[in-house]
């Protein structure tokens, strides 16, 4: 089978590139492949009460139509530069902001609209001032929260639109290889069940998301495609009583606060705050980390957020992914395949937590399928020091987060995929192959991943 465009990965980057292509040119023959399942078939066994993680491959939470974001809490950050996302590396600031606005319009078209945060800009500015007085930095971002419980139906809406326009969607298609025979002839080999298929495309868009980062690196190594190693962020998922943070989260849903630690001078930040949310496991095929999400309709009595410290390696080893995986595997050895939970008091006092002490606390854990243990046995001393010092400083901004009963789950690791070297349209030099989204190191959240899809699609549209 021959196609004008083959898109590998049906996450935000892949979906938005397909949308842009078929909307602007209805004659294009497009195939969209994903190693995971369609929205209706993305069923995690843990959805049934009492069922532990089955280590499915592919993981229904991370892979499938909509990407890893489908079962996230659906926070949309409308900003061109945040964390590992920086669209201004590929275009001017004004063009990046315009692109973000265009991305928002498409989200809105498919009902992915919600109340805008900060809900009160004057109060948000006062909060930022309070953070600055405490010696830290608050980044104000235009945000919308869609909720984990509503995202699947929105993603289904995009998929229905694409299929109605003639895009071929192929689920559970595990791409094995991409072979370039000429600039405009590429052979994509994928496995579906026990069968192996080969399809041909004039243009290839590679967008397998975070779970495809390792595969992209293997592909780059195989064909000599240059890439740059990037930093990672390592830390914990912090869980506190919801009312402790409501004064801030009612105004700024997901406050991103940057803190400089004293001992090492490192930067640690809050990230992915979930008011009334739930701590969740994240399966990386071989090891388990933690994450968090929030539903639109169902709320817990707690709020959780990531508290992560940036790690950059220089020489002789620059492979930060391998470093992060090593920490995760140590945690899984100690937790017997499960994340570790520890009270802040126990971490400070240098003793492992036990469930009978955690259960006596004032915070009921929202993730029970974990092991009470000692995070100091998992993470380097430097990371633990940053967490403890960071929480002390954060307590000056949000009193109560440094309480003894505060719960810490670990490890939380934000892998920054190696960045494939491309031109500013994300295209390789001598082939019509594009690398976009999180897995290619070009984006780090739902909105910027979607934006990279628009850029690649528009470059293809100019040439077809």
Task: Briefly describe each language-model feature range.
Residues 56, 64-117:
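Dinucleotide-binding Rossmann-like beta1-alpha1 core, especially the glycine-rich loop
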Residues 1-80, 122-464:
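Residues forming the flavin
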């Amino acid at each position: 089978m021959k196609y004008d465009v083959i898109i590998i990965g049906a996450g935000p980057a892949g979906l938005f590139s397909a949308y842009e292509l078929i909307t602007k040119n209805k004659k294009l023959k497009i195939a969209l492949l994903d190693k995971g399942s369609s929205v209706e078939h993305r069923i995690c066994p843990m959805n049934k009460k009492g069922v532990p993680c089955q280590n499915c491959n592919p993981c229904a939470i991370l892979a499938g139509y909509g990407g890893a974001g489908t079962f996230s809490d659906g926070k949309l950050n409308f900003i061109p530069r945040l964390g590992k996302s920086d669209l201004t590396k590929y275009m001017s600031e004004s063009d990046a902001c315009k692109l973000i606005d265009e991305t928002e319009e498409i989200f809105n078209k498919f009902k992915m609209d919600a109340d805008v945060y900060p809900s009160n800009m004057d109060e948000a500015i006062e909060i930022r001032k309070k953070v600055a007085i405490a010696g830290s930095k608050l980044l104000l971002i235009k945000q919308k929260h869609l909720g984990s419980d509503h995202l699947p139906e929105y993603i289904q809406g995009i998929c229905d639109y694409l299929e109605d326009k003639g895009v071929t969607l192929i689920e559970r298609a595990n791409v094995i290889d991409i072979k370039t025979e000429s600039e405009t002839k590429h052979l994509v080999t994928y496995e579906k069940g026990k069968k192996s298929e080969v399809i041909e495309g004039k243009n290839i868009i590679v967008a397998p998301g975070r779970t495809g980062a390792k595969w992209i690196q293997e592909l780059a190594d195989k064909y000599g495609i240059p890439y740059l190693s990037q930093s990672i962020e390592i830390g914990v998922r912090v869980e506190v009583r919801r009312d402790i943070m409501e004064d801030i989260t009612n105004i700024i849903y997901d406050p991103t606060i940057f803190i400089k630690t004293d001992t090492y001078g490192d930067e640690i930040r809050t990230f992915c705050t979930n008011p009334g949310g739930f701590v969740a496991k994240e399966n990386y095929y071989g090891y388990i980390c933690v994450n968090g999400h929030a539903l639109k309709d169902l709320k817990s009595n707690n709020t959780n957020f990531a508290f992560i410290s940036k790690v950059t390696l220089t020489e002789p080893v620059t492979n930060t992914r391998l470093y992060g995986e090593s920490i995760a595997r140590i945690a899984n050895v100690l937790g017997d395949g499960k994340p570790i939970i520890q009270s802040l008091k126990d971490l400070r006092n240098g003793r492992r937590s036990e469930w009978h002490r955690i259960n006596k606390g004032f915070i009921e854990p929202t993730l029970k399928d974990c092991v009470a243990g000692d995070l100091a046995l998992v993470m380097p001393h430097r990371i633990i020091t940053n967490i403890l010092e960071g929480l002390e400083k954060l307590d000056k901004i949000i009193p109560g987060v440094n309480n003894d009963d505060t719960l810490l789950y670990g490890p939380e690791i934000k892998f920054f995929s190696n960045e494939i070297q491309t031109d500013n349209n994300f295209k390789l030099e001598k082939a019509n192959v594009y690398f976009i989204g999180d897995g290619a190191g070009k984006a780090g959240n739902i909105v910027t991943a979607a934006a990279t899809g628009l850029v690649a699609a528009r470059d293809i549209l100019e040439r077809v």
